């Protein structure tokens, strides 16, 4: 049971922070299907920086890891500007823009990974190999049966994500910026009439989404494979979008959806081990979160609390 909780959290929390990014963007009124590409590009930037500076630190130093997280967030937010440019400046279809960003990220990072490995590191590889992240166990509280597993063998990024998620919740629901952002997704003309720049608020929301997606991407790179490669694009971004939809674009219910996906995945892996199934069944287990997504769509698709102006191109002159 403990291993299911430990592994489930290490999958659910990066997914959760990516979903929060999607909530920020869609609450502002901009459809965000580019989470997959943003997390991949952010992970690419973070992994490259981590490998480039690793030689300046001892093998067990956590500094490259934390710098990688920062740079992944920066990389994701910068790459998100493409989506912002297409949607806000050129008023492109937001769904198509998201798909384009995803495809561009996949192709660009695959090419640049090989190029940088050859030019910078003198290697013929299609991946950046990362160091294995250390884990943290919180003394005392980790001894509590079942609940203690939440505080056992934590990746450092799990604590970072919890802190960032709390800040994101506070900003969204307890600040004027969050109020204006939510209003942009429901009635952008009212926001404009109040003297606020709808375009600037939506730009900020898109960049926040990019930063949080990039953070989630580098966390997946460290926890799942300890490297960056094209295998980072396996649908985690779309799973984050599904989670925020099931959470009705609210942060706390979205956390519940992410935990459900995480525990379904880790529980499936544990089941394979307990039943001593062939290792090939582990690949089958990877589809459990997506099967769960389809089932939830069947039962909860009618409970849609999306922002009223989501996906609607804002025209200041139209009323």
Regions found by a protein language model. Name each.
Residues 186-193, 197-200, 271-319:
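Cytosolic-side transmembrane-helix boundaries in multi-pass membrane proteins
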Residues 105-173, 275-285, 312-319:
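Transmembrane helix-bundle core of multi-pass membrane transporters
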Residues 1-19, 31, 45, 56-67:
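Membrane-interfacial amphipathic/re-entrant helices at transmembrane-helix boundaries
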Residues 151-228, 256:
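Helix-loop-helix "hairpin" substructures at the membrane interface of multi-pass membrane proteins
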Residues 59-106, 265:
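Alpha-helical transmembrane segments within multi-pass membrane transporters and channels
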Residues 213, 223-290:
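Transmembrane alpha-helical segments in multi-pass inner-membrane proteins
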Residues 26-45, 88-101, 180, 224-238, ...:
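Short, non-helical or kinked segments that cap or interrupt transmembrane helices
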Residues 18-19, 43-49, 106-110, 158-171, ...:
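Hydrophobic core segments of alpha-helical transmembrane domains in multi-pass membrane transport
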